[in-house]
UniProtKB/Swiss-Prot annotation:
InterPro entries on file: GlcNAc_PI_deacetylase-related, LmbE-like_dom_sf
Annotated family: Belongs to the PIGL family.
Name of the protein in question: Uncharacterized deacetylase YaiS
Origin superkingdom: Bacteria
């Protein structure tokens, strides 16, 4: 599975290998690929995380979901966390802006000594409109990255047919659970 990442810590361009994890809301990345990120971070791979929306729909606004997310992603080993403020439950209306934002992040905000080799993002068999929109934006914006993997979340349809499975040790699952505990909302 990790032939793209395991061969060496340097990419073909003599840059550090990197991962880009993209989620629609605070907690999506942690739920969907948290254990994998913890494993890859321990291997020394650079990890950047992008949370596309505020995630505040259905909350009273007192809890800062971005702060929860920053703390959780730090536990997973993310080196860089970027929170965008697209409207929660309205991501499908902002598709072009999300594509532009992701392209800008890839081009201008990832350190110049890092080459993104893999993307973890939402997938197209998800019933949440924000998840589906983030999947669509990710597929366009990340089209030049060698590997794009979709991760499962609780709103996944039964039609989701995973083709890649990552085996993770219990220690990484424990790290994932610790990260999820940072989400009080």
């Amino acid at each position: 599975m990790d032939k793209v990442l395991d061969s060496a810590l340097l990419s073909s361009a003599n840059k550090r290998k990197g991962i880009l994890a993209i989620g629609a809301h605070p907690d999506d990345i942690e739920l969907g690929c948290g254990a994998s990120l913890a494993r890859l971070a321990q291997k020394g791979i650079y990890i950047a995380a992008v949370v596309m929306t505020t995630g505040n729909s259905g909350t009273d606004g007192i809890i800062d979901r971005h702060e929860e997310s920053r703390n959780a992603l730090k536990i997973l080993g993310c080196h860089q966390t970027i929170h965008l403020n697209f409207a929660d439950t309205r991501a499908h209306l902002q598709l072009n802006d999300m594509i532009s934002a992701l392209e800008d992040i890839i081009k201008n905000q990832i350190p110049s000594d890092v080459e993104i080799m893999r993307v973890y993002t939402m997938h197209d068999a998800d019933r949440h409109q924000d998840h589906l929109a983030v999947y669509q934006a990710s597929m366009v914006a990340c089209r030049t990255i060698p590997q794009i993997l979709g991760y499962e979340t609780p709103s996944t349809w039964l039609s989701f047919m995973p083709q890649v499975f990552e085996s993770v040790k219990e220690e990484y699952f424990t790290v994932k659970l610790a990260a999820l505990k940072k989400h009080k909302s």
